[in-house]
Amino acid sequence: MKVHEYQAKEIFSTYGIPVERHALCHTADGAVAAYHRMGVNRVAIKAQVLTGGRGKAGGVKLANNDRDVYQYAQTILEMTIKGYPVTKILLSEAVNIAAEYYISFTIDRNTRSVTLIMSAAGGMDIEEVARQSPEKIIRCSIDPLIGVPDYLAHKFAFSLFEQAEQANRMATIIQDLYKAFIEKDASLAEINPLVLTPVGTLLAIDAKMVFDDNALYRHPDLQKLSEPTEDEKLEAIAKERGFSYVRMDGEIGCMVNGAGLAMTTMDMIKLYGGNPANFLDIGGSSNPVKVIEAMRLLLDDKKVKVVFINIFGGITRCDDVAIGLLQAFEQIQTDIPIIVRLTGTNGNMGRELLRKNNRFQVAQTMEEATKMAIESLKKESI
């Protein structure tokens, strides 16, 4: 689960990580009022959206008077950035910057550990820095039994700072960020940039946190911060019904039993020139109610023009699946072509049952079924 910058900064503040003065606003008038309350000369007006690239999209502006604050706030609040409408903005004190740094804790799948990543090249896309100047990146795996004790925090801090006073402040921030990362079950805690001001203060002027969805039940406070997209709402509904569902951008809706087969189905669709509309694993049940719910989930996506049902009968018998499909489609009214591939236990019986109903196009092999789906899509697109 992602959270907005202002929410991440609130969490950072509770852990003692220094952030600049800021205020959340929902209107241009509110932004001007907040500007007066803050009593600073210059502010950064930043769109609050759960996606990157807001600066390049014009979602971050600097202002130093009422007119500019109002104008920029109004403009940003009317924007949509990568499909996300901007409904709130963050007014942040624009601090003087002597240097910028990058610091984050994340999960490194290669080392199977929490990893600290630091760089003196802050304020930039860290992945771009890693590609172009990998020598500027410092990576350290963290032993979960030790964490980040004082001696390690100071060792890390002195790799970026020579002066003891600044290194001591950095060491404290490293420890506080690690504590927030662990206690909140985060998969990412990032400050980019962490700035050094001319007077020697360190401030997190941008903040990012991502949390493990599977651990949210332990954090009611974080659950309240969730702002799911429409796709995420559908995925949550599917999860409640026992499905694994992820919406995509294609036109061929997939209903499959088993995650591995679902991945293979999507690969086959791509191989033959199509695009899957979703990942949908309905598990091993042939229950008609489950099929109905899965179909309604697919058909809620208006981009779906063809449905590809791919079932491998292992413990689940194909004739039971066929009966479930027939019962389900007595209640589902749709003109969308339905391609069904049934193979495995009692596969012949299952296919024979479905062929008696002209509602389905039936196949035995995945290749045959995929070609049927692509051909049907071409006809629907004419």
Swiss-Prot record:
Catalyzed reaction equations: succinate + ATP + CoA = succinyl-CoA + ADP + phosphate; GTP + succinate + CoA = succinyl-CoA + GDP + phosphate
Binding site residues for substrate: 257, 314-316
Residues reported in the UniProt entry to bind Mg(2+): 192, 206
Source taxon at top rank: Bacteria
SUPFAM superfamilies per UniProt: Glutathione synthetase ATP-binding domain-like, Succinyl-CoA synthetase domains
Gene Ontology cellular component list: cytosol; succinate-CoA ligase complex
Molecular function via GO: ATP binding; magnesium ion binding; succinate-CoA ligase (ADP-forming) activity; succinate-CoA ligase (GDP-forming) activity
EC numbers: 6.2.1.5
Keyword annotations of the record: ATP-binding, Ligase, Magnesium, Metal-binding, Nucleotide-binding, Tricarboxylic acid cycle
Biological-process GO terms, alphabetical: succinyl-CoA metabolic process; tricarboxylic acid cycle
Coiled coil start-end: none
Cofactor: Mg(2+)
Family in the record: Belongs to the succinate/malate CoA ligase beta subunit family.
Oligomeric form and interacting partners: Heterotetramer of two alpha and two beta subunits.
Name assigned to this protein: Succinate--CoA ligase [ADP-forming] subunit beta
Gene name of this polypeptide: sucC
